[in-house]
Amino acid sequence: MSTATTTTAENAGLPAMLDTKDVAEMFKRCNLAVYAEARRIYYREVNLNPCKKYPKQVLQRIEWWFWDWFAYDCAVSGIGLTGNESEDLRIELQYGPGAGISPFLALAEFMYDKDERIGTREIRDFRELDDTNFASMFWIRDASAVKGRLTVEDIIHGGVYEVADVHAASQYDGAHGGMIVNRIAHVRGVGRSWSIP
């Protein structure tokens, strides 16, 4: 069992990152039933018209959102992945507030136990990301490419956040308005963007 982990060795100031596609792919290999059930739930909610042809970019974006939703918003039973095939097949999706742990955290904890490249710093980043991340719709109050930051207002839950995201800040530089759907988390004392805006 191995997965790709993007750590920021070239910049120790940035947190470690685990790609949500890798999380979904690992669960697809270790417990296809959990992966398939989550996929059915997600696509039922998305409710795409099967008779309509969608552009490839739309379908890719929906798939990216599935990876994020599965990794961060689903919950699985027990302690998560163990590396023991028969144990991992017993994992089930959990429902309700506070039930289980996220697939993201399950894989992060597994990697911390099994992969010497994942140390104390990385697992702390993963746990903090898992604790603080949330997805919402945000109104862009300000974007500065120079600062590499966005100031966004959560229009669903309320609150204003300053988010470090060089790519999005460059893309929306100078914007004082406009809406994005994004996932943000507070890791290492800084709000950061954790999905594709």
Q: Predicted segments — roles?
A:
Residues 1-137, 142-147, 167-197:
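Mixed-charge, low-complexity intrinsically disordered regions
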Residues 141-162:
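OB-fold (S1/OB) nucleic-acid-binding surfaces
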